Structures are given as structure tokens and as C-alpha cells.
């Protein structure tokens, strides 16, 4: 694999791994505030970030040794309102800056596996941002967000509210490849 795409995969793995941990902590905070659906949303999206990290990791399975992952992260956790704003900022960075650049570099370098991994994550992060914005609107009005079941594809991390699709619109995985967060 070409070095720039390889480093982008390492960085994306680091960023998605950090997002997973951050969202687990944010979920715990929401639970403490009795915002059960916000907590469930953070848990579901944390799981999707875990899937993204795993996809990037699999593209790097040939590596052996220690590597530095340079990735954007957000700090300063607080109440659920602040945590949702931090989550939206992180997702926005991935949508507007990180993944579009990584996709173009992988495409230019003809690294098809990396490109696919980046494209799957990019498509999913847009849904994460929309779900977090919906939750923030509810929290800002003093109530928990109204959410149905949240589905996460175990292959690409695609996340949606509602019924499980027969086929994942991102990666083509079948219905039984989804995990439901109720």
C-alpha cells in the first residue's frame, strides 16, 4: 500500500477508536441525566465507530509494529447538551474535511480497499450528524429525544433509526448483519 493512504488509514483508525471511547463516556453521562434515548443513541453510534475502526484496521492487517495515529479529537466533556455539540463537531470534521480528502488520495493512489473503507465511513458519518442534531434539538428543549429502534450494520457501520432494511444501502449486507439498539 502507498504510504500516504496507509498513514490516512492509521489516522482514521485512531480517530474512529477515539470516537468510540468518547461516545461510550457520553452515553454514560446521558444515562446519569436520565436521557435514556440520548444514551442509547451514543451507544449505537459508538458501535458504528467501532465497526469503522475495524474496517480500517483490516485494511492494515499486513502491518506489524508501532505507528503514530494523527487524528482529530474533541475534549471537554460535560453535560449531554455539550457532549452532543462535541459529537456534531467531530462528525462535521469527518464529513467536510477528513474523509473527502482521504477518499481522493486513496482513489488517486488506486488503493481500492482503503477507498471503500473511507467511503463507507463517510456515508455513515452524515447520518450520525443528523441523529445527533435531532437529539440536541430535543435536549435544548428540555426533553429526551424521541427515537425508534436504531440499526447498525456490522459490515460498514451504516446507522439508521427505524426498521432494519433488507439490504444495507451502503455495503449491500443482508438484514441479519444489523444490530438493533432498542
Question: Which ranges hold each PLM region?
Answer:
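Non-heme di-metal
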Residues: 1-182
Amino acid at each position: 500500500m502507498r504510504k500516504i493512504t496507509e498513514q490516512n488509514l492509521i489516522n482514521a483508525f485512531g480517530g474512529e477508536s477515539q470516537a468510540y471511547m468518547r461516545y461510550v463516556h457520553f452515553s454514560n453521562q446521558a444515562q446519569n441525566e436520565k436521557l435514556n434515548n440520548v444514551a442509547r443513541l451514543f451507544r449505537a453510534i459508538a458501535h458504528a465507530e467501532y465497526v469503522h475502526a475495524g474496517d480500517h484496521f483490516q485494511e492494515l492487517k499486513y502491518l506489524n509494529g508501532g505507528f503514530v495515529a494523527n487524528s482529530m479529537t474533541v475534549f471537554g466533556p460535560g453535560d449531554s447538551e455539550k457532549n452532543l455539540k462535541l459529537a456534531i463537531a467531530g462528525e462535521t470534521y469527518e464529513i467536510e474535511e477528513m474523509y473527502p480528502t482521504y477518499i481522493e488520495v486513496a482513489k488517486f493512489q488506486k488503493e481500492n480497499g482503503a477507498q471503500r473503507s473511507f467511503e463507507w465511513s463517510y456515508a455513515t458519518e452524515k447520518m450520525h450528524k443528523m441523529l445527533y442534531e435531532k437529539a440536541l434539538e430535543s435536549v435544548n428543549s428540555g426533553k429526551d429525544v424521541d427515537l425508534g429502534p436504531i440499526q447498525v450494520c456490522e459490515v460498514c457501520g451504516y446507522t439508521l433509526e427505524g426498521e432494519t432494511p433488507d439490504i444495507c444501502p451502503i455495503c449491500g449486507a443482508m438484514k441479519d448483519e444489523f444490530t438493533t439498539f432498542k
